[in-house]
Amino acid sequence: MPVRFDCFVTGTDTEIGKTLASAALLTALAGAGYRTAGLKPVAAGTLAGAPERTNEDIEQLRAAATVGLPMATLCPWLLDAPMSPHLAARRAGVTITLPPIVDALAQARTQADAVVVEGVGGFRVPLSDTFDTAQLAVALGLPVVLVVGLRLGCLNHAALTAEAIAARGLRLAGWIGNVVDATMAGLDDNVATLRRWIDAPHLGTIPRLPRPDARLAASHVDIAPLLAR
């Protein structure tokens, strides 16, 4: 039986490929013999016309996982409005709290050897007036995988995010580059700089893909450093 592995995936910003990277991790872990589950504890913006109330990120994680989970476990806080979660929750008349998320992770861990928990937006997105994604990561206590959206400005964003993770006593287990801007000048030089600056293994760089493809993305990700710790 594989040694248990769970992680919290965060990113340098929103729309930088966290879901694709999370799905790639799930695919790679399944290839290593793990029973996998993906959680999106908080999601804002539901799919119009879907047969059930869901979200695009949730569906990508569900497709990449090998363990099927009910929606209430996959995403304890699914909000309709595509905006910052604390604002979407306010519009829905609810307050995002930690206990349902902790319960969802516990339930997922009873069925899967590896759970990938994808955060929402960047590392310090407000979930309520007093609670943000950084506090969620601390409460869950999982090793963190940072997804760096490779575009102009990523060096500053990555350095600040890695610093914020370390300041909270969390272990940065690795980072994944995801090419957001295929025309970015000095792409390879930026990746080399990130490798020097970020005190964690570089798990790989996902190129700009024509469409999200977890299996193809996984071919660019090396999970060995994650499983060796």
Curated annotation (Swiss-Prot):
The keyword ATP-binding applies. It is found in: Cytoplasm. It comes from Ralstonia nicotianae (strain ATCC BAA-1114 / GMI1000). The active site is at residue 40. NCBIfam families: bioD. The keyword Transport does not apply. This is ATP-dependent dethiobiotin synthetase BioD. Its EC number is 6.3.3.3. ATP binds at residues 15-20, 57, 118-121, 207-209. Its cofactor is Mg(2+). Gene3D superfamilies: P-loop containing nucleotide triphosphate hydrolases. Belongs to the dethiobiotin synthetase family. Catalyzes a mechanistically unusual reaction, the ATP-dependent insertion of CO2 between the N7 and N8 nitrogen atoms of 7,8-diaminopelargonic acid (DAPA, also called 7,8-diammoniononanoate) to form a ureido ring. Coiled coil: none annotated. It catalyses: (7R,8S)-7,8-diammoniononanoate + CO2 + ATP = (4R,5S)-dethiobiotin + ADP + phosphate + 3 H(+). Keywords: ATP-binding, Biotin biosynthesis, Cytoplasm, Ligase, Magnesium, Metal-binding, Nucleotide-binding. It is an enzyme of class 6 (ligase). Pathway: Cofactor biosynthesis; biotin biosynthesis; biotin from 7,8-diaminononanoate: step 1/2. Mg(2+) binds at residues 19, 57, 118. One of its GO terms (biological process) is biotin biosynthetic process. One of its GO terms (molecular function) is magnesium ion binding. It holds the Pfam family AAA_26. Homodimer. The gene is bioD. GO terms for cellular component: cytosol.
